[in-house]
A protein has these predicted regions:
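N-terminal secretory signal peptides that target proteins for export/translocation
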Residues: 1-13
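Short, low-complexity segments with poor structural confidence in diverse proteins
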Residues: 5, 28-30
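N-terminal export leaders
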Residues: 13-15, 39
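Bacterial N-terminal signal peptides
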Residues: 16-28
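Formylglycine-dependent sulfatase
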Residues: 30-262
Length: 262
């Protein structure tokens, strides 16, 4: 993807302060019966549908051929809405309930601390396990220190932000990663590359029962502001691309501090 430079001021960014689901991509394996396809669910932070070229509203400078290929054989969400904050949005996805209907989910402790009671807020992945699926989660986690490994996920490689507040700002590298419930270890490398590698390994058969259909929730963090691309993209980003700023629906915010008005 070729991206122009973005303003560090998130209120002036096209991405605003949203956590959205870009696509659900359902990939059916020829070896499985039609009613139990493999499921790859890609979930990203702070990303507009205008930055995925398979969507009609995408900006002319966007080019995402790999995602487009997946979307062509899967499903795109074109008329859907999710909450605008990390934890509530994930709570909705994991439970299938509106944010205010998710019992026990709460912010607790230092940001981004959060907790929940799995008995009061069960995740629907457990139903897939009962239906014969093997389940996996790879990437960012921001829904309580309990990541659900062993209960909801058979396989998990996780960056647990609530558990490690001191590491919660490391969206792009040097993340504390736990592999299948093990002690978290500092992990080098660009997070998007790491998550993609681990997801590819899982899809190709590592860490799962090859006789079962699989469900993988893949949560990328690298699209989160302040938008720091991998070093290899140096020189591919055109600083002259003109990006029109969206209309501010809140106006000039009279009476608010200067930093809010910006």
């Amino acid at each position: 993807m070729k991206l122009p430079y973005q303003s560090s001021n998130r209120s002036r960014s096209l991405f605003a302060s949203l956590t959205i689901v870009t696509a659900i991509l359902i990939l059916a394996s020829r070896s499985l019966v039609a009613d139990k396809p493999n499921i790859l669910y890609i979930y990203t932070d702070d990303q507009s549908d205008r930055t995925v070229s398979s969507y009609e509203r995408s900006q002319p400078w966007v080019d995402t051929p790999n995602i487009d290929r997946l979307a062509s054989s899967g499903v795109r969400f074109k008329h859907a809405y999710n909450g605008t904050w990390c934890m509530p949005a994930r709570a909705t996805f994991l439970t299938g309930k509106l944010q205010y209907g998710v019992q026990s989910m709460r912010m607790e402790g230092d940001y981004p601390g959060s907790e929940y009671d799995p008995k009061k807020a069960p995740f629907w992945m457990s139903s897939f396990k009962k239906a014969g699926y093997t389940t996996a989660h790879i990437g960012k986690w921001h829904t309580g220190t309990d990541t659900g490994y062993g209960r909801d996920w058979d396989h998990q490689i996780v960056w647990n932000r609530p558990k490690f507040p001191e590491n919660s700002g490391n969206y792009y590298d040097n993340q504390l990663i736990s592999f299948n419930g093990s002690e978290a270890k500092m992990t080098k490398g660009y997070s998007t590359d790491n998550y993609t590698k681990w997801a590819t390994n899982y899809i190709e058969g590592q860490g799962r029962d090859g006789k079962k259909p699989w469900l993988l929730w893949l949560c990328f963090a690298g699209t989160h502001g302040p938008f720091t691309p991998a070093d290899r993209h140096e020189g591919t980003i055109d600083p002259k691309v003109n990006i029109p700023l969206p209309t501010d629906i809140f106006g000039h915010r009279p009476g608010k501090p200067q930093y809010v008005k910006k």
